[in-house]
């Protein structure tokens, strides 16, 4: 492709409303343009990357034996009513009526449509297991679209759904999808981690997220330094204490703490060791009989709301009690709450069960107890894992310690069980002629999100540094002053044609532009391999080659350049 015949709409300045580097670079490199909040047009360079990502995803799906279909973006509301999600889904579900006043939605996901299809098309166990997938546009009316295509309202996604009668084939398909997702991201040249994830409101028995590692990632991943274990911070298991409860060495004393509303203030003003303090958090209870529950964690730890949400006594969805509710129940504000004397159920983190001589709120305004000890001052409460793990703690497999990394979720696989098939009566006859509800798996990849995530991981101060497999073009040719030099023009044209004939995707900048502009644009769009042609190089019989990712430069003889670049393009 010649730039003179191409739409290369680069921008020098960073757009003011672009918060993250991928959004900035996609706009500056002429990959996307904003139409409205969360809606984007993909320009030629962006679309080339998107299609390459899509092709790799499709190839790996086909290898698993999954069969491609295409479902409609517009879905009838009746299906959503059937599963109960018509009422459960919030305003992110865009609803509208056709001219006959029938309700429809723009699909944010396709579980209802695929389950409806399968219950009509499948009748026998002989047709199972079956995996169907599509690459389709989705729409979610996000309250605040941000980060460009990272969190857009309209996005491209691959979603696959598998159907089974037994757990064994479900597990086999799940494992195949796990492998396929790893292959997808490996082929794209991205650093990533599959992590154990919470199944959330969807439910099911197993869930993994696939995260592209990037410092700008919104998700915190806890992984083992000595094994493949990794989990989303909400799912990572905290280790059990390795020491036992020590005997008391202090008497419990009531202390006035008028200016200590937080653990940090208590530690600073009273010279207390933070690991000798606890935080008591009051949350909504699951029943009218138990309206409030106290959760107690060590002062330097953070409550894990996902773990707390799963506790039998705690309301789901998880919700903190209001200050009014706390004062009515305890007689003090949130900064003065502690476990001593509380009449509501108390659940403590495992780490708190081995604490002695610790400090906590006294359930009286501006007062704390110091020197609290279990059994002596209050009965040992029910214990559970309710906190986030901390870097350096042992991982549950015993093979390493926790380290932390930031990640961008680009894929998610679930074992759904019968969540949708049961509510929609999706059954087939088993070998005994008895109707059985189908087991389902769900496997999603954010195709357009991968593009942004790849840029978040692969960039420098000059622009994008594309991995080979998903770059818009493999080679960029920069002929210096070709409109003034016939030699440069002739050799550039020959190299361009030779590379095209060899199947290499090449972009030649044949514009009448200053060299500085040409170099800046080529580095901005991030093509992996750049060849510079000038009169001085021609005199020496070499091309100047630069690797965009490593910055390495070398001179390549004329007769070796095509073979060199062809091999480089193969990675």
UniProtKB/Swiss-Prot annotation:
Catalyzes the attachment of proline to tRNA(Pro) in a two-step reaction: proline is first activated by ATP to form Pro-AMP and then transferred to the acceptor end of tRNA(Pro). As ProRS can inadvertently accommodate and process non-cognate amino acids such as alanine and cysteine, to avoid such errors it has two additional distinct editing activities against alanine. One activity is designated as 'pretransfer' editing and involves the tRNA(Pro)-independent hydrolysis of activated Ala-AMP. Pfam families: HGTP_anticodon, tRNA-synt_2b, tRNA_edit. Keywords: Aminoacyl-tRNA synthetase, ATP-binding, Cytoplasm, Ligase, Nucleotide-binding, Protein biosynthesis. SUPFAM superfamilies: Class II aaRS ABD-related (SSF52954), Class II aaRS and biotin synthetases (SSF55681), YbaK/ProRS associated domain (SSF55826). It comes from Shewanella frigidimarina (strain NCIMB 400). NCBIfam families: PRK09194.1, proS_fam_II. Belongs to the class-II aminoacyl-tRNA synthetase family. ProS type 1 subfamily. This is Proline--tRNA ligase. One of its GO terms (cellular component) is cytosol. It catalyses: tRNA(Pro) + L-proline + ATP = L-prolyl-tRNA(Pro) + AMP + diphosphate. Disulfide bonds: none annotated. The keyword Cytoplasm applies. Its EC number is 6.1.1.15. Homodimer. It is found in: Cytoplasm. It is an enzyme of class 6 (ligase). InterPro entries: aa-tRNA-synt_IIb (IPR002314), aa-tRNA-synth_II (IPR006195), aa-tRNA-synth_II/BPL/LPL (IPR045864), Anticodon-bd (IPR004154), Anticodon-bd_dom_sf (IPR036621), Pro-tRNA-ligase_IIa (IPR002316), Pro-tRNA-synth_IIa_bac-type (IPR004500), Pro-tRNA-Synthase_IIa_type1 (IPR023717). The gene is proS.
